Amino acid sequence: MNIDNIWDDDQKLIPAIIQDKFTKDVLMLGYMNKESFRKTLESYKVTFFSRSRKKLWTKGETSGNYLNYYSHEFDCDEDTILVQATNEGPTCHLEKYSCFGLSLIHI
């Protein structure tokens, strides 16, 4: 698999699902471009492209709650990436282990 085939456009963003390496829980969803993916592989710190700030964002650079990259897999369409990582603290900005888990509707 060639990174240039996945990111045929340097500005293209793909969803990145972050999964706890050990528990397999989903921790968060972010977006990666080619540059943030390369930085993740080089630094072993999960790095996203912030759509609101229009720049790279390494998870934990402000809070210290880094996500340490372990491995990745692309889906069958090569338009979503699953990243396995370990966290150095709460993943969510609300100081929770995961950004997921809030149930608003009970059926």
Where are these regions (language model features)?
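Conserved small/polar residues in nucleotide/adenosyl-binding loops
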Residues: 105-107
